[in-house]
């Protein structure tokens, strides 16, 4: 099964479970959790079911396209369901069956791995899912997002697409993975991997990046003062990515690092609180729609 078929299979599976299928969000981010489809929609009482592929940029993991297991940009298949259903583990195992992985024939383990994202003020109870000794999925019950308690709790399932494909296709080098007939990851992404690594570690302008961080931070605050959550959050994401570029370049000291993470976290908390307050003013409309559908 190639990666394109894997994605289509997961989309069909989770669509059948009532998930909205959305496209990836168009601002740089380090993980699918950072998409507003997860970060914002996990807040408040309104029900939410979504599945989407998210390209995730990790500048420090760039290896010029030379490492068989490390990528500047990898892909995650993200599922968020709120409130978390009682049979979520069963639904997940069914998704593996749809991918041709029979849980009865493989060693599938849920290894406790509680999750935290300090820069976004997020935390949750979680497990890594191991398939025959290799991590393929992260399972998390959100307890806190943007510093706010999650009521009700959302469940997040994050499939590592390249990791899972390596197992399904039995390939040791990520660049040999077949995306679709006639196209490998090498064909599609190796040039970008090389160039982004050169930029990250060699040609990026550190002074400019520090200026951009300050500009993005200022604009995020300015938009929040106007009550504009989504534009503000876009600039929080830009702050986070710019910080990651600076961090990968070694431009931020250990003591400075803590301060920069706190600055991003403070922005994320403001956005989370503003979003919650704005939805509350609207009377949490999706909650009313859910109640009406059951009448």
From Swiss-Prot:
It catalyses: tRNA(Gly) + glycine + ATP = glycyl-tRNA(Gly) + AMP + diphosphate. GO terms for biological process: glycyl-tRNA aminoacylation. Its EC number is 6.1.1.14. It is found in: Cytoplasm. InterPro entries: aa-tRNA-synth_II/BPL/LPL, Gly-tRNA-synth_heterodimer, Gly-tRNA_ligase_asu. Keywords: Aminoacyl-tRNA synthetase, ATP-binding, Cytoplasm, Ligase, Nucleotide-binding, Protein biosynthesis. It is an enzyme of class 6 (ligase). Disulfide bonds: none annotated. The keyword Cell wall biogenesis/degradation does not apply. One of its GO terms (molecular function) is catalytic activity, acting on a protein. GO terms for cellular component: cytosol. Transmembrane segments: none annotated. The keyword Thylakoid does not apply. Tetramer of two alpha and two beta subunits. Belongs to the class-II aminoacyl-tRNA synthetase family. PANTHER family: GLYCINE--TRNA LIGASE, CHLOROPLASTIC_MITOCHONDRIAL 2, GLYCYL-TRNA SYNTHETASE. HAMAP family: Gly_tRNA_synth_alpha. This is Glycine--tRNA ligase alpha subunit. It comes from Bacillus licheniformis (strain ATCC 14580 / DSM 13 / JCM 2505 / CCUG 7422 / NBRC 12200 / NCIMB 9375 / NCTC 10341 / NRRL NRS-1264 / Gibson 46).
């Amino acid at each position: 099964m190639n990666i394109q078929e894997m994605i289509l299979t997961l989309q069909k599976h989770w669509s059948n479970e009532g998930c909205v299928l959305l496209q990836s969000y168009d601002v740089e981010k380090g993980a699918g959790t950072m998409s507003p489809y997860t970060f914002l929609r996990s807040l408040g009482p309104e029900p939410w079911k979504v599945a989407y592929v998210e390209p995730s940029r990790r500048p420090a993991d760039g290896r010029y396209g030379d490492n068989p297991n490390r990528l500047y940009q990898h892909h995650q298949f993200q599922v968020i369901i709120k409130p978390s259903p009682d049979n979520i583990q069963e639904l997940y195992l069914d998704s593996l069956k749809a991918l041709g992985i029979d849980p009865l024939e493989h060693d599938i383990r849920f290894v406790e791995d509680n999750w935290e994202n300090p820069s976004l003020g997020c935390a949750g109870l979680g497990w890594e899912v191991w398939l025959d000794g290799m991590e393929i999925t992260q399972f998390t019950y959100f307890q806190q997002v943007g510093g706010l308690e999650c009521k009700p709790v959302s469940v997040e399932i994050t499939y590592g697409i390249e990791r899972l494909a390596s197992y399904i296709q039995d390939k040791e080098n990520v660049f040999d993975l077949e995306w679709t007939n006639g196209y490998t990851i090498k064909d599609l992404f190796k040039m970008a991997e090389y160039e982004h690594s050169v930029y990250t570690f060699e040609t990026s302008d550190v002074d400019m990046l520090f200026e951009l961080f300050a500009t993005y931070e200022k604009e995020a605050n300015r938009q929040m003062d106007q009550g504009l959550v989504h534009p503000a959050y876009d600039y929080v994401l830009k702050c986070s990515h710019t910080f990651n570029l600076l961090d990968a370049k070694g431009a931020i000291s250990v003591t400075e690092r803590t301060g920069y993470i706190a600055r991003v976290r403070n922005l994320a908390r403001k956005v989370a609180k503003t979003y919650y307050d704005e939805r509350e003013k609207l009377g949490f409309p999706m909650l009313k729609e859910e109640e009406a559908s059951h009448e």
